[in-house]
Amino acid sequence: MNIVILAAGTGKRMRSALPKVLHPLAGRPLLSHVIATARTLQPSRLVVVVGHGAEQVQAAVAAPDVQFAVQAEQLGTGHAVRQALPLLDPAQPTLVLYGDVPLTRASTLRRLVDAARDGSYGILTVTLDDPTGYGRIVRDAAGFVTRIVEQKDASPEQLKIAEINTGIIITPTGQLAMWLGALKNENAQGEYYLTDVVELAIEAGFDVVTSQPDDEWETLGVNSKAQLAELERIHQRNVADALLVDGVTLADPARVDVRGTLRCGRDVSIDVNCVFEGNVTLADNVTIGPNCVIRNASVGTGTRIDAFTHIDGAELGANTVIGPYARLRPGAQLADEAHVGNFVEVKNAVIGHGSKANHLTYIGDADIGARVNIGAGTITCNYDGANKFRTVIEDDVFVGSDTQLVAPVRVGRGVTIAAGTTIWKDVAEGVLALNEKTQTAKSGYVRPVKKKS
């Protein structure tokens, strides 16, 4: 089977310099959703017709299995499909999809393909409570499709028809080439409409079969930011419903956003206003507090992530405790039972089993052993303005508050570092490390007093 995806439109109503099909839905371009669905049908040829912003669109979705045809002039959907013909296998049927209709299920498309498997011309239709503005499916007394009539051309009787054309079709490719060549642009827009092909198919004696989706939102397209927002909510609610079916507890299904893939174990709980991006895995009994952002991360069994925590590119072991207001950046690896508390930032660092950095700390480019306590205000000084260096803290080290570790530096097992110490040399095992300081008290000091105005 050939699949052609039309993605050449300008999208004027989006009021954006970004091509319409590249506007994001759940963190991915609209067109990427359509391509992903198309791939599940295993087409022999997958062709995307580009036009407005062609180079930008091609760069965004380029892949070995995707070919591109260019519609240099926007002369209608029929003209767009015509540009793809040289790239198609004429011996295989062609399914036509739209780059701005992202939510059509693969199962819906398979039903349409199956309905037209005998070489018929197939149309995906949908029945709407309010079909205003759409082309109506006109049938004869026996129920066979005779034509598609646009709203402006419909008679009062035809306007009562609730079944409308979605634009998604499957057709024999050899005949499609002939029908496209016979299209005329005798309309107000001067365009060649793909919908006109159905009458040519009927005139040629082809059966026209139809199929419908399970839900009408599967056929909704995007022509404005309002419609994009509507589809985003539909998609996110579908994702939330699937999570609920899988046993995930959502404090409010309307207030969780998944912009990628979220895999959850048993008894996972997610509070409100959480965003998941990229590939995220939550193991059994994970609890996520409100207002967290988690991107490309794996979270171990029994972990608790408190409110306002940001996690990006991190790996968390079992029974870790993170936040609130913590930030784990790419390369952060936390072993089982590690704690990273409020206003702690970890980047490209390993924190060992049971180690804790509970508040106000920066840990970057570091290897921290097991059972280490990092006091408040500790900083690994890892950057000299040009190069990054690592800090190594071995097992059972106690780091006092307001400590600076100037990398590259190693702190041996069992060391105690006094509060307010700057470490710039390696420290041997088991010692107390401190900077000698003298505390002085002076009598007779008078504090300055502000003058009254």
From Swiss-Prot:
Its EC number is 2.7.7.23, 2.3.1.157. Acetyl-CoA binds at A376, N382, Y383, S401, A419. The active site is at H359. Residues 226-246 are annotated as: Linker. Keywords: Acyltransferase, Cell shape, Cell wall biogenesis/degradation, Cytoplasm, Magnesium, Metal-binding, Multifunctional enzyme, Nucleotidyltransferase, Peptidoglycan synthesis, Repeat, Transferase. Pathway: Nucleotide-sugar biosynthesis; UDP-N-acetyl-alpha-D-glucosamine biosynthesis; N-acetyl-alpha-D-glucosamine 1-phosphate from alpha-D-glucosamine 6-phosphate (route II): step 2/2; Nucleotide-sugar biosynthesis; UDP-N-acetyl-alpha-D-glucosamine biosynthesis; UDP-N-acetyl-alpha-D-glucosamine from N-acetyl-alpha-D-glucosamine 1-phosphate: step 1/1; Bacterial outer membrane biogenesis; LPS lipid A biosynthesis. Residues 1-225 are annotated as: Pyrophosphorylase. Residues 247-453 are annotated as: N-acetyltransferase. It is found in: Cytoplasm. Binds 1 Mg(2+) ion per subunit. Catalyzes the last two sequential reactions in the de novo biosynthetic pathway for UDP-N-acetylglucosamine (UDP-GlcNAc). The C-terminal domain catalyzes the transfer of acetyl group from acetyl coenzyme A to glucosamine-1-phosphate (GlcN-1-P) to produce N-acetylglucosamine-1-phosphate (GlcNAc-1-P), which is converted into UDP-GlcNAc by the transfer of uridine 5-monophosphate (from uridine 5-triphosphate), a reaction catalyzed by the N-terminal domain. In the N-terminal section; belongs to the N-acetylglucosamine-1-phosphate uridyltransferase family. Homotrimer. This is Bifunctional protein GlmU. It comes from Burkholderia ambifaria (strain ATCC BAA-244 / DSM 16087 / CCUG 44356 / LMG 19182 / AMMD).
